[in-house]
Amino acid sequence: MENRCLPKKVPGFCSFRYGLAILLHFCNIVIMAQRVCLNLTMVAMVNKTEPPHLSNKSVAEMLDNVKNPVHSWSLDIQGLVLSSVFLGMVVIQVPVGYLSGAYPMEKIIGSSLFLSSVLSLLIPPAAQVGAALVIVCRVLQGIAQGAVSTGQHGIWVKWAPPLERGRLTSMTLSGFVMGPFIALLVSGFICDLLGWPMVFYIFGIVGCVLSLFWFILLFDDPNNHPYMSSSEKDYITSSLMQQVHSGRQSLPIKAMLKSLPLWAIILNSFAFIWSNNLLVTYTPTFISTTLHVNVRENGLLSSLPYLLAYICGIVAGQMSDFLLSRKIFSVVAVRKLFTTLGIFCPVIFVVCLLYLSYNFYSTVIFLTLANSTLSFSFCGQLINALDIAPRYYGFLKAVTALIGIFGGLISSTLAGLILNQDPEYAWHKNFFLMAGINVTCLAFYLLFAKGDIQDWAKETKTTRL
């Protein structure tokens, strides 16, 4: 085999691989904004206090209902509407993950982003028909968004040099926290000024425009890129020359099921999505019930955790690649470090939120820290599958996401039931359940996680020259 050396001078941030990371970053912002905006608009959409048969309204109130249609949905129906997006995501994970190992993902991602955006435009008229039609739209939106979030991982198998994986993936994944930040920040103002339907129209139009840019700018393989410099092409190709090519090959399912390092990743993905979904979905509700603020202030306060989470995600990417490139820590040590920070720190802060939040400021601080420190996982278990089985990364990412989404679906539904049945101690039950899951899964990860390619992922390999 020919020994190819890495080019001495390689384009850094101003390069096409970082351009791809930024483009995916914006895609993730949009799909998360489309997903999360309902968490806040629900406060404006639903009449929680006035029975529907009362009609003693002023002209101003009737005009406001034209701008802000109010629906009489019970707490159980609201929980179904909020969680229905995860039903769609469950359906699509494994098919897209399997296809990402054998087929180019750029068309699937672009089409799915466009579909999610069109469905966002349809939610306000669907709400006028009834909650059932909104649930249908959200399920279909979940299918489209699941294709975007899962399919993008297969792209990095061809584009991310090993020593830049933390940086590139954290830049991309940080869009998942910037999306809620933007959605919650602006949705309150839009609801107040223009009415809640405009939230869905604005994010839907932005997504449609971005999908057009996606089709114009993205190329699936760096070797086929017409404008990329030869030095960057050589750098990416040389960095990945020992990586197993992920074409159509049989999946070693039996070996995967016996792999403790893989189960460590799966369990912590479950814990991460359980925690993340609980906090993302119910932060506006927690703020509304504990701090008693209006919808605009709620949006501002709910968005704060995601600004800090965005910063934490970017910092984590820089730190992890620094520790690896300087050979300060091994790959497995870096993954365990950032998994611990991302899974255990939120536990500490939700417990503080329950027992040490004596006033408005302490509540906001602990809630912000609980949400934001989850982002350290971006450089932990969330990309660990790329270390242990790059050939099957797309498929494994889909499987871990599928099991994680079940956690998100269960956590959001269960939290709604607990809030409905036991309002006084609901937050204690929800947060302690989250803490127990996180600590158990983290302990398993610290015992069994690995950072090198596993034997079952090396079988019948074909080296890329």
From Swiss-Prot:
Membrane topology: Multi-pass membrane protein
Residues passing through the membrane, by range: 79-99, 117-137, 176-196, 199-219, 260-280, 299-319, 337-357, 363-383, 399-419, 431-451
Residue positions with a glycan: 39, 47, 56
One GO process term, biological-process aspect: sodium-dependent phosphate transport
Protein localization: Apical cell membrane
Assigned keywords, A-Z: Cell membrane, Glycoprotein, Ion transport, Membrane, Sodium, Sodium transport, Symport, Transmembrane, Transmembrane helix, Transport
PROSITE patterns: MFS
Record-linked InterPro entries: MFS (IPR011701), MFS_dom (IPR020846), MFS_Na/Anion_cotransporter (IPR050382), MFS_trans_sf (IPR036259), Pi_cotranspt (IPR004745)
A cellular component term, taken from the record's GO annotations: apical plasma membrane
Description of how the protein assembles with itself and partners: Interacts with PDZK1.
Job of this protein: Important for the resorption of phosphate by the kidney. May be involved in actively transporting phosphate into cells via Na(+) cotransport in the renal brush border membrane. Plays a role in urate transport in the kidney.
Family statement drawn from the similarity comment of this UniProt entry: Belongs to the major facilitator superfamily. Sodium/anion cotransporter family.
Name by which UniProt lists this protein: Sodium-dependent phosphate transport protein 1
Taxon lineage: Eukaryota, Metazoa, Chordata, Craniata, Vertebrata
Underlying gene: Slc17a1
